[in-house]
Amino acid sequence: RQLMPQPLSGVSLRDKRKVTDALLKSGATINEFNTVRKHISGFKGGWLAKKAYPATVVNLILSDVVGDPLDSIASGPTVPDPTTFQDAIEILKHHGLWNTVPASVRRVLLDGKRGVIPETPKLGDKVFEKVHNIVIGNTLTASLAAYRSVQKAGLNGLLLSSRLEGQARDVGTMFASIAKEVAA
């Protein structure tokens, strides 16, 4: 059975993948990705906490998101979601995807906007009272470990940033420029 990628009832995993692929090609930000994913998921956006309630949940988190915002890491399965179905609809429209995403996704988002489907759990919901989110590793700890390994190997290393964000093609171009400068 699916857990992490589990879509909301009415949306197939294939349709969820189509939306994810379309968002990727559109240049959507990670926050935009997460907003849409949370609203077509049965697990993300606080739903794991809601399903686990009233149990105590201890979530040990490895973050690959700059700044470690808990609602963005893995799309926040155990934290309140500040976004709405309306936000997800606006993101798809902003990127020109609303009319091209699967009909099942549009239907779920519209049903959510109308209140037919419940909104993701929000700040103040009792389901979060016994949830403990602990970041045990992130981009900074990984970057520092890599840097120390380089030094230990007797190589000259330079840690430029653990907080780099942007489109991979743009960041890659920047790193290539730095490498050419160092080599010159």
List the predicted regions and their residue ranges.
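Hydrophobic alpha-helical hairpins/lids featuring a short glycine-rich hinge
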Residues: R1-S9
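Generic, well-ordered alpha-helical scaffold segments in large soluble proteins
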Residues: A22, A145, S149, I178-E181
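Generic preference for well-ordered secondary structure
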Residues: P7, S72-S75, K130, L159
